[in-house]
Curated annotation (Swiss-Prot):
Propeptide stretch(es), residue numbers: 20-40
Record keyword Signal present: yes
Record's comment describing the protein's domains: The presence of a 'disulfide through disulfide knot' structurally defines this protein as a knottin.
Tissue specificity note: Expressed by the venom gland.
PROSITE patterns listed in its UniProt record: SPIDER_CSTX
Entry similarity comment: Belongs to the neurotoxin 19 (CSTX) family. 04 (U1-Lctx) subfamily.
Organism of derivation: Lycosa singoriensis
Lineage, uppermost ranks: Eukaryota, Metazoa, Ecdysozoa, Arthropoda, Chelicerata
InterPro entries for the chain: Spider_toxin_CSTX_knottin, Spider_toxin_CSTX_Knottin_CS
Protein name: U1-lycotoxin-Ls1b
One Pfam family in the UniProt entry: Toxin_35
Length: 106
């Protein structure tokens, strides 16, 4: 039984090592970098409107920005919702503490 398991493991390793996925690891890395760059271009920057895409805010220094919404009343009395990407208060406090700690401890 042990011999069968070892032989199966060896066959799996040999077939895996001969596959094309391992031949070019630099291409896989390049593709992942390109995908990350594309994601960065598509995200919504801080203080920009995110009403139509509430989960598309970019990442800040430490945290991802959150889509914060408010209700706006026009002169006609119509209520509409407007949203923007921003830093929530508890994230601002955490960034302040981390920044203060960096100044003190180097």
């Amino acid at each position: 039984m042990k011999v069968l398991v070892v032989v199966a493991l060896l066959v799996t390793l040999i077939s895996y090592s001969s596959s094309e996925g391992i031949d070019d690891p630099e291409a896989d890395e390049l593709l992942s970098l390109m995908a990350n760059e594309q994601t960065r271009k598509e995200c919504i920057p801080k203080h920009h409107e995110c009403t139509s895409n509430k989960h598309g805010c970019c990442r800040g220094n430490f945290f991802k920005y959150k889509c914060q919404c408010t209700t706006v009343v026009t002169q006609d009395g119509e209520q509409t919702e407007r949203c923007f990407c921003g830093t929530p208060p508890h994230h601002k406090a955490a960034e302040l503490v981390v920044g203060f700690g960096k100044k003190i401890f180097g």
